[in-house]
Regions:
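C-terminal motif of bacterial Sec signal peptides marking the signal peptidase cleavage site
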Residues: 14-16
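Compact, glycine-rich, soluble single-domain proteins
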Residues: 18-148
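Exposed boundary/loop context
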Residues: 9-10, 39
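Sec-dependent signal peptide recognition
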Residues: 2-9
């Protein structure tokens, strides 16, 4: 009985450690904890109405297919870097230091220069800090489910 209790405790402890890792990506040697937006409602809401985001956090938008993308900052209160990646998770376009916008539907679009399937939003200045160049690889952690 004591051995079974000990085994159950260890299993629970290990399960807690695995989930504590969270959902992460790596870019430019830096790990970021990310929220995933992989359906229309989540992609539409994005980072709206947030007053701040920890420096090591971001949001990863996953689209069903690679195609030209365009994002805007409607109701977004924090400046962001918007980074576009193709299906191979290579950086194909960057919109750096995009300012917040409170103009509602009057906010300008920020398009990708090439077809993209993944879009990563980080705090403004991160792309410059990492010295990102097109072709940089986005690595995804095991918690990121990528549909085929």
């Amino acid at each position: 009985m004591r051995l079974a209790t000990c085994f159950c405790f260890i299993a629970l402890l290990l399960n807690g450690c695995a989930s504590a890792g969270g959902t992460w990506i790596e870019l430019g040697g830096q790990r970021y904890m990310v929220e995933i937006a992989d359906d229309d409602a989540e992609r539409q809401r994005g980072l709206m109405f947030r007053d701040a985001m920890p420096i090591d956090h971001g949001m990863l938008f996953i689209h069903d297919r690679e195609e030209p993308q365009s994002y805007w900052m409607k109701n977004t209160r924090i400046a962001l870097d918007i980074l576009y990646f193709d299906s191979a998770r290579k950086l194909v376009a960057q919109q750096r230091d995009v300012p917040p916008c409170s103009l509602g539907d009057g906010c300008p679009p920020y398009p990708s220069d090439a077809p993209a399937r993944f879009v990563l939003e980080l705090n403004a200045g991160e792309a410059a800090r990492l010295k990102l160049q097109d072709g940089a690889e986005l690595r995804v952690g095991p918690g990121v489910a990528i549909p085929r």
